[in-house]
Amino acid sequence: MELDEVIITRAIFDEYSKTFLDYTDIDVALVGGGPANLVAAKYLAEAGVKVALYEQKLSLGGGMWAGGMMFPRIVVQEEATRILDDFGIRYKEYESGYYVANSVESVGKLIAGATSAGAEVFNLVSFEDIMIRENDRVTGIVINWGPVTTQRLHVDPLMIRTKLVIDGTGHEAVVCNTILRKIPNAKIGELGLLGEKPMWSEVGERLAVNATQEIYPGLIVAGMAANAATRAPRMGPVFGGMLLSGEKAAKLALDRLKTI
């Protein structure tokens, strides 16, 4: 067969355009492609939810790729190994209760698990703003191309309608910060301000799950964004809390969708 470059171009443009249009009205928008949102994406998609994940960078995985200080290994607690099992991620016990996995394999299989389950990924697409309706409830997200955002180009965005948003943007908690900045008298969490505390792995891991919640009408926080939204400590390259937070975020979203 002789390849035709124009057909290649048309195939890519046509198929992506159809997908993009189909996902302008969805059930759940996951902002940020880190481990918590990848876990949530898999479980939501498996439940039949129309879910899309938006990541500003080219690659997904957040800070998991590099493990700890570029040593490509991560630690996971025993209670989260069942999620590793769900994704087919290999691990071994280092000491009692401490399990070690290859960070590159972990990210690859998290991505494969989410996409194989049916979650649609839009990488190189950045979150710019939220959409609101009555009582300032979150009803969608405003997006642009990632390079437009990073290069600070003056290009108007496009909009996605969604029933729920999950902020999985890590330390920056970008969606939460947008709400605080743009909605008068909006309150995120009990303290109404953002930013995680310094390192305390034990407390940070525990609170990552506890802090995963619908923190504002239409907005669920997950992963490190949940810690940032509730002033909980950071935890470093131990990822059990991130995985369990993603699982909890999916469960919360499924329950909430029944009421919308």
Curated annotation (Swiss-Prot):
Keywords: Iron, Metal-binding, NAD, Thiamine biosynthesis, Transferase
Cofactor(s) the record lists: Fe(2+)
Pathway participation: Cofactor biosynthesis; thiamine diphosphate biosynthesis
InterPro entries: FAD/NAD-bd_sf (IPR036188), Thi4_fam (IPR002922), Thi4_prok (IPR022828)
Annotated SUPFAM superfamilies: FAD/NAD(P)-binding domain
Domain of life: Archaea
Catalysed reaction, written as an equation: hydrogen sulfide + glycine + NAD(+) = ADP-5-ethyl-4-methylthiazole-2-carboxylate + nicotinamide + 3 H2O + H(+)
GO molecular function: iron ion binding; pentosyltransferase activity
Uppermost EC category: transferase
Binding residue positions for Fe cation: D156, H171
Residues engaged in binding glycine: R234
GO BP field: thiamine biosynthetic process; thiamine diphosphate biosynthetic process; thiazole biosynthetic process
Binding sites annotated in the UniProt record for NAD(+): A36, E55, Q56, G63, H154, V155, D156, M224
E.C. number: 2.4.2.59
Annotated Pfam families: Thi4
Function recorded in the entry: Involved in the biosynthesis of the thiazole moiety of thiamine. Catalyzes the conversion of NAD and glycine to adenosine diphosphate 5-(2-hydroxyethyl)-4-methylthiazole-2-carboxylate (ADT), an adenylated thiazole intermediate, using free sulfide as a source of sulfur.
Subunit structure: Homooctamer; tetramer of dimers.
HAMAP family noted in UniProt: Thi4
Family, similarity comment: Belongs to the THI4 family.
The protein's name: Thiamine thiazole synthase
